[in-house]
């Protein structure tokens, strides 16, 4: 089972669009499947993001909340709007060799 952390800025209230989010997540998960020669059923999503949890449930992919334990993480997919806390998390993922990719997102101005 490959455990994939899907993470975003902690105070970020939404995404540019659901369509963009799910397409991006699907593309990155396909990349992981190719790298590890596995199926989507061999992946477990770790996330506290409602959209990631909804995506996982809709696609019958196991998911669980991320408990800040980096030993539980095999790969990281990040959605980043430039928050300094998020940059630290991305740097940690890079230093551990876990980062799949980063998608830069814009904050909703509402």
List each language-model region with its residue ranges.
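Residues that mark the start of a beta-strand
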Residues: 1-5
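Acidic/glycine-enriched connector segments
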Residues: 8-110
